[in-house]
């Protein structure tokens, strides 16, 4: 990954967290953005949030225009990528892997 793309994603992550914190919806302004992946050319960004609730993801989709407007004003960019919000389940996967490794370790201890 090149440095420009990393910087862009990092800046966008910070701006998105600020934008969410400024919303009037208590469910949205307490969300955590964990990761942002931008496509080439900054046309599209995949935004990972710590929520698996479809209702919250739907609210984010409805608020996309306000969020993009905030990003444009705060960043000074000419255009903002189209945002797609998805649930970040990497923490759940990591917890499952840890549980599996613990079971394996217990099995070895019993031998």
From Swiss-Prot:
<dbReference type="GO" id="GO:0005737">
    <property type="term" value="C:cytoplasm"/>
</dbReference>
<dbReference type="GO" id="GO:0030490">
    <property type="term" value="P:maturation of SSU-rRNA"/>
</dbReference>
<dbReference type="InterPro" id="IPR023799">
    <property type="entry name" value="RbfA_dom_sf"/>
</dbReference>
<keyword id="KW-0963">Cytoplasm</keyword>
<dbReference type="InterPro" id="IPR000238">
    <property type="entry name" value="RbfA"/>
</dbReference>
<keyword id="KW-0690">Ribosome biogenesis</keyword>
<protein>
    <recommendedName>
        <fullName>Ribosome-binding factor A</fullName>
    </recommendedName>
</protein>
<dbReference type="Pfam" id="PF02033">
    <property type="entry name" value="RBFA"/>
</dbReference>
<dbReference type="InterPro" id="IPR020053">
    <property type="entry name" value="Ribosome-bd_factorA_CS"/>
</dbReference>
<dbReference type="InterPro" id="IPR015946">
    <property type="entry name" value="KH_dom-like_a/b"/>
</dbReference>
<comment type="function">
    <text>One of several proteins that assist in the late maturation steps of the functional core of the 30S ribosomal subunit. Associates with free 30S ribosomal subunits (but not with 30S subunits that are part of 70S ribosomes or polysomes). Required for efficient processing of 16S rRNA. May interact with the 5'-terminal helix region of 16S rRNA.</text>
</comment>
<comment type="similarity">
    <text>Belongs to the RbfA family.</text>
</comment>
<comment type="subunit">
    <text>Monomer. Binds 30S ribosomal subunits, but not 50S ribosomal subunits or 70S ribosomes.</text>
</comment>
